[in-house]
């Protein structure tokens, strides 16, 4: 709750609400004295009521608030002369404002609590994820143990199978031996049978012989019996004869004796003959039978021998065949067994493989489901977080407005820490202040309208309609903004003069941190915002999901102007704001951007990066590194910001150019493509592409997916790139912590793009990463030119990814491009500014004539990059030598002084225009008719401003050489301070949030602070 200590003791001087239409714009004056408390410096404001550590940030903020409240202080001076009738109204407004601030602070505290709850929830989710990973690791370890045991068992099975095969072979050999023995047994049995058959034959022969012998014996016996009979008969006859002889006489006895002798001789001889015949027959028959049997036996034995030989040979063949058959069968069985084992192994492996595949697929499905769930949760949380951030930014804007008014009143009355003196240009102030208030009110209202209307436009319009409307609107818008920027320039000069008189030294000394941090945040945001158009066109899954978004890149471009344009305002407000009609659109537009981002679907993705990076990159690079991988993983960002950074030197510029789509922007695609090592392989191709891009963002979107492919390779090459841009952006506070450095940054960046462009034009394929490393750090930061060794030590990832440094240098070229895109076309390319400034000035003088002449100049300047392609080499040599001189304070101040003259207040006018363009397209067309006269005015003052710029650049180099040695110790001391602040930041999250919210104040107060420094430089 902001303390308005002396509310009842207000000065008697009259206070009336300024410009009755705006409730936020009022003037407060309070008594000076010991009793009066200072609302911004000493009080615990509601903005910081939620943190105890915010006292330091609040105490460091008077100069911020003073700078931010310049307009309100001048307005309050104007209202002092209105008379006493407005005093009571001022008291009432102060009380109502107290109540409003209390309500806002309560809401803000609620949002902060919600953010903390979400952070606690995120931490719990991270713990659960870690536990799940550990469980998975445990399961994988058990799986390895089981696999080891299974492998051992499989080895044992294989060994047993081999042993079984050997045993089978041995068994087969034994079976062969058994068969051989059996065969021998069969042979022996056969031989025995043959012998038995022979024995039987001989037995039969013996029987036959025995039978023959029996017959012969019988015959012999019969013959012997016959012989005995004959003998008896003969004896009987002889007895008879002898009896007769004896009986008959001697004669007769003699005669009988003679006859008997004769008979006896005949019988004996006959017997002898018979016996001889029988013996002969018997011998002959025996001999014949013996001979016959002998012949027959010989024949049979010969036949038996032949048969046995044949049988033996056949048996040998049979045995041989049997052996071969057995060998084959054993081999076949062994092969069958091996085949069976292999088939079993194969089936087991297949089963295992199928089981593994099924388990892996299940795991993949589970992980996919978890990933989708986590992505959805992350997206929801990011959206909630973005909503909170958007609300916070809106509150910051309101509170910053309050602070500006309060600080302005304090400074005006003389309660500020620095004495107050009226500037010379006060007579102009009253009209200016009323304009400012009207525009600030318009900003807030238009932001709210634009958020809703852009969403509706996205859903309803189609691609072709949107592209045509956006091109027409942007061309008209460019003309309107040119006119309004000139008016804003006068207002800003008046404010700057007033601010300079109040506190030139105090603002430089008291807010180095603010100024340093705000450019850091601006730079940090600028890459993210430069990326966002690319993401919206090519990568954001939101486009893939919603056909309306994919169909209407023009809408995305219409929405992304606040994002893509904010880097130009933030990084180099001084030159960029006047020169780029649509893109140098002031921190006010940046503030308005946050609510617009809340509802636009693309901004729901990119703003998370923009605003999450803006605090984190400025204050905690560790958080940024943590966030950048998250961005890489998040489905919305599909492909890491690193990719987008690496490829977006061109893309970040081309979407910006497309958004404007005026003839002036036909140049800038040429540059973007000439610079990109991926896109622009020749400036001719770049020129060929530029009309297509100027005509249709659809083509741009078609090209962006091609760009999206190459970054994937870049991501594969440098996984550290996702972190290195964050680190580089996070280290920017170390390299630019003083207002001097901040101011030096904008001009040096204006010139560093020259080097980056010449490098890219020379070598579209990034000839040597070493040179790019040496040059791009020098281009990006003044201190890098002095100590590249420190830079490489701090960011080894920078050395590893020269692509990123190239990507960063082009990001800083964005402000330069914006300058180029301006209707005046002061600096189409820095190299052209140096080499061909006289012809450009001639072209610029012709510029206000007609937009047709501007288009002709665009085509000429598109051809200019081709002619100047050899020249960049010469310029590159000159620029590294000139870069260190550029770092000095004098050059920074002079360039900013020039920029201030060129850049009045496009800041406040621009956002209203941008969002009106997005919301109400018919309104813009009506405004075109009104504001075309302003067009010429905006162009005319920018001519002298451009001529001035060439001369100071030459002076700056000499002055900066003299002041190099002085700057180096300062930069080193500030780098150390930055390291300390970074180390303290983790312990002070609340202070960081306070500083984040105060970044808007820093952005608003930047122009008046620069104006004071410009005057100091002129005084020197």
Swiss-Prot record:
It comes from the Eukaryota. Residues 289-292 are annotated as: Linker 2. GO terms for molecular function: dynein complex binding; kinesin binding; microtubule binding; protein kinase binding; protein-macromolecule adaptor activity; structural constituent of cytoskeleton; structural constituent of postsynaptic intermediate filament cytoskeleton. The modification Phosphoserine is found at residues 76, 124, 347, 421, 511, 526, 532, 540, 546, 552, 560, 566, 574, 580, 586, 594, 600, 606, 614, 620, 628, 634, 640, 648, 654, 662, 668, 676, 682, 690, 696, 704, 718, 724, 738, 752, 763, 787, 795, 822, 888. Sequence repeats lie at residues 525-530, 531-536, 539-544, 545-550, 559-564, 573-578, 579-584, 593-598, 599-604, 613-618, 627-632, 633-638, 639-644, 647-652, 661-666, 667-672, 675-680, 681-686, 689-694, 695-700, 703-708, 709-714, 717-722, 723-728, 737-742, 745-750, 762-767, 786-791, 794-799, 821-826. There are a number of repeats of the tripeptide K-S-P, NFH is phosphorylated on a number of the serines in this motif. It is thought that phosphorylation of NFH results in the formation of interfilament cross bridges that are important in the maintenance of axonal caliber. Phosphorylation seems to play a major role in the functioning of the larger neurofilament polypeptides (NF-M and NF-H), the levels of phosphorylation being altered developmentally and coincidentally with a change in the neurofilament function. The keyword Zinc-finger does not apply. Residues 525-826 are annotated as: 30 X 6 AA repeats of K-S-P-[AEPV]-[EAK]-[AEVK]. Residues 245-266 are annotated as: Linker 12. Residues 146-244 are annotated as: Coil 1B. Residues 511-1020 have a biased composition (Basic and acidic residues). Residues 71-82 have a biased composition (Polar residues). Residues 58-83, 456-1020 are annotated as: Disordered. It is found in: Cytoplasm, Cytoskeleton; Cell projection, Axon. Residues 293-413 are annotated as: Coil 2B. One of its GO terms (cellular component) is cytoplasm. It holds the Pfam family Filament. The modification Phosphothreonine is found at residue 768. Residues 133-145 are annotated as: Linker 1. Residues 1-100 are annotated as: Head. It is linked to Amyotrophic lateral sclerosis: A neurodegenerative disorder affecting upper motor neurons in the brain and lower motor neurons in the brain stem and spinal cord, resulting in fatal paralysis. Sensory abnormalities are absent. The pathologic hallmarks of the disease include pallor of the corticospinal tract due to loss of motor neurons, presence of ubiquitin-positive inclusions within surviving motor neurons, and deposition of pathologic aggregates. The etiology of amyotrophic lateral sclerosis is likely to be multifactorial, involving both genetic and environmental factors. Charcot-Marie-Tooth disease, axonal, type 2CC: An axonal form of Charcot-Marie-Tooth disease, a disorder of the peripheral nervous system, characterized by progressive weakness and atrophy, initially of the peroneal muscles and later of the distal muscles of the arms. Charcot-Marie-Tooth disease is classified in two main groups on the basis of electrophysiologic properties and histopathology: primary peripheral demyelinating neuropathies (designated CMT1 when they are dominantly inherited) and primary peripheral axonal neuropathies (CMT2). Forms heterodimers with NEFL; which can further hetero-oligomerize (in vitro). Forms heterodimers with INA (in vitro). Belongs to the intermediate filament family. Neurofilaments usually contain three intermediate filament proteins: NEFL, NEFM, and NEFH which are involved in the maintenance of neuronal caliber. NEFH has an important function in mature axons that is not subserved by the two smaller NF proteins. May additionally cooperate with the neuronal intermediate filament proteins PRPH and INA to form neuronal filamentous networks. This is Neurofilament heavy polypeptide. It comes from Homo sapiens (Human).
């Amino acid at each position: 709750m902001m303390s308005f200590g002396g509310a009842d003791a207000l000065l008697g001087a009259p206070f009336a609400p300024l410009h009755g239409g705006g409730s936020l714009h009022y003037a407060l004056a309070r008594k000076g004295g010991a009793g009066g408390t200072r609302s911004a410096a000493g009080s615990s404001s509601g903005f910081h009521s939620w943190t105890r550590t915010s006292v330091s940030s609040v105490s460091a903020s008077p100069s911020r608030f003073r700078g931010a409240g310049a307009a309100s202080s001048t307005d309050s001076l104007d209202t002092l002369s209105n008379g006493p009738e407005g005093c009571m109204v001022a008291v009432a407004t102060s009380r109502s404002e107290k109540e409003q601030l209390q309500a806002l602070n309560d809401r803000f505290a609620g949002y902060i609590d919600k953010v903390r709850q979400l952070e606690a929830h995120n931490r719990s989710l991270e713990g659960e994820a870690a536990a799940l990973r550990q469980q998975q690791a445990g399961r994988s370890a058990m799986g390895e143990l089981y696999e080891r045991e299974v492998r051992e068992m499989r080895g044992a099975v294989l060994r047993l199978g081999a042993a079984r095969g050997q045993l089978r072979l041995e068994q087969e050999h034994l079976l062969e031996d058994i068969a051989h023995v059996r065969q021998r047994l069969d042979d022996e049995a056969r031989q025995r049978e043959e012998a038995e058959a022979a024995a039987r034959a001989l037995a039969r022969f013996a029987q036959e012989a025995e039978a023959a012998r029996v017959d012969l014996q019988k015959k012999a016996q019969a013959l012997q019996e016959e012989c005995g009979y004959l003998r008896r008969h003969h004896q009987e006859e002889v007895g008879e004869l002898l009896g007769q002889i004896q009986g008959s006489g001697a004669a007769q006895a003699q005669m009988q004796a003679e006859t008997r002798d004769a008979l006896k001789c005949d019988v004996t001889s006959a017997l002898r003959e018979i016996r001889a015949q029988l013996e002969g027959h018997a011998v002959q028959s025996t001999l014949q039978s013996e001979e016959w049997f002998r012949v027959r036996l010989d024949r049979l034995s010969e036949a038996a021998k032949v048969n046995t030989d044949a049988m033996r040979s056949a048996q040998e063949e049979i045995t041989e065949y049997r052996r071969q058959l057995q060998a084959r069968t054993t081999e076949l069985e062994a092969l069958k067994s091996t085949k069976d084992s292999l088939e079993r192994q194969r089936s087991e492996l297949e089963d295992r493989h199928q089981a593994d595949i099924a388990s892996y697929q299940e795991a993949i499905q589970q992980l996919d489901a978890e990933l989708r769930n986590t992505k959805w949760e992350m997206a929801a949380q990011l959206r909630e977080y973005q909503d909170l951030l958007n609300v916070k930014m809106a509150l910051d804007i309101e509170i910053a407005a309050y602070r500006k008014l309060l600080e302005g009143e304090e400074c005006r009355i003389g309660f500020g820490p620095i004495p107050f003196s009226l500037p010379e240009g006060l007579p102009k102030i009253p009209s200016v202040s009323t304009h400012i208030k009207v525009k600030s009110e318009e900003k807030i209202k238009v932001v709210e309208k634009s958020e809703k209307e852009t969403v509706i436009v996205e859903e309803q319009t189609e691609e072709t309609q949107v592209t045509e409307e956006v091109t027409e609107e942007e061309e008209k818008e460019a003309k309107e903004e040119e006119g309004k920027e000139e008016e804003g320039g006068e207002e800003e000069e008046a404010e700057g003069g007033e601010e300079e008189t109040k506190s030139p030294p105090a603002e430089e000394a008291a807010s180095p941190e603010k100024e340093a941090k705000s450019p850091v945040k601006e730079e940090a945001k600028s890459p993210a915002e430069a990326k966002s158009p690319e993401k919206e066109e090519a990568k954001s899954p939101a486009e893939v999901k919603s056909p309306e978004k994919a169909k209407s890149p023009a809408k995305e471009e219409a929405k992304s102007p606040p994002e893509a344009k904010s880097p130009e305002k933030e990084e180099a407000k001084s030159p960029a704001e006047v020169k780029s009609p649509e893109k140098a659109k002031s921190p006010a537009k940046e503030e308005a951007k946050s609510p617009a981002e809340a509802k636009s679907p693309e901004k729901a993705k990119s703003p998370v990066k923009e605003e999450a990076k803006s605090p984190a990159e400025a204050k905690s690079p560790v958080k940024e590194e943590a966030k950048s991988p998250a961005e890489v993983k998040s489905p919305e960002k599909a492909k890491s910001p690193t990719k987008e950074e690496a490829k977006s030197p061109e893309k970040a510029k081309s979407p910006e150019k497309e958004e404007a789509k005026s003839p002036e922007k036909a140049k800038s695609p040429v540059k973007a493509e000439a610079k990109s090592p991926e896109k622009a392989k020749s400036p001719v191709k770049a020129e060929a592409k530029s009309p297509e891009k100027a005509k249709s963002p659809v083509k741009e979107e078609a090209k962006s997916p091609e760009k999206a492919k190459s970054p994937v390779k870049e991501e594969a090459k440098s996984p550290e790139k996702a972190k290195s841009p964050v680190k580089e952006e996070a280290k920017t506070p170390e390299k630019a912590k003083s207002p001097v450095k901040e101011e030096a940054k904008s001009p040096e960046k204006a010139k560093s793009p020259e080097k980056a462009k010449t490098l890219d034009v020379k070598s579209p394929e990034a000839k040597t990463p070493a040179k790019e490393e040496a040059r791009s750090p020098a281009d990006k930061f003044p201190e890098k030119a002095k100590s590249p060794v420190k830079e490489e030590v701090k960011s080894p990832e920078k050395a590893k990814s020269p692509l990123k440094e190239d990507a960063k240098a082009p990001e800083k070229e964005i402000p330069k491009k914006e300058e180029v895109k301006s209707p005046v076309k002061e600096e189409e390319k820095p190299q052209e500014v140096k080499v061909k400034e006289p012809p450009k000035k001639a072209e610029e003088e012709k510029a206000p004539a007609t937009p047709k002449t501007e288009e002709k100049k665009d085509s000429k300047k598109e051809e200019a990059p081709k002619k100047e392609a050899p020249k960049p080499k010469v310029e590159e040599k000159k620029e590294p030598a000139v870069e260190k001189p550029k770092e000095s304070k004098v050059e920074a101040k002079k360039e900013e002084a020039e920029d201030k003259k060129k850049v009045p207040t496009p800041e406040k006018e621009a956002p209203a225009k941008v969002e009106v363009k997005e919301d109400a397209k018919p309104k813009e067309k009506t405004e075109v008719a009104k504001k075309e006269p302003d067009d010429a005015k905006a162009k005319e003052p920018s001519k002298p401003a451009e001529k001035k710029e060439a001369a100071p650049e030459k002076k700056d180099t000499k002055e900066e050489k003299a002041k190099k040695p002085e700057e180096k110790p300062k930069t080193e001391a500030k780098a150390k301070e930055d390291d300390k602040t970074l180390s303290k930041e983790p312990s002070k999250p609340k202070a960081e949030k306070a500083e984040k919210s105060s970044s808007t104040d820093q952005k608003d107060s930047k122009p008046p602070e620069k104006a004071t420094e410009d005057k100091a430089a002129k005084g020197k």
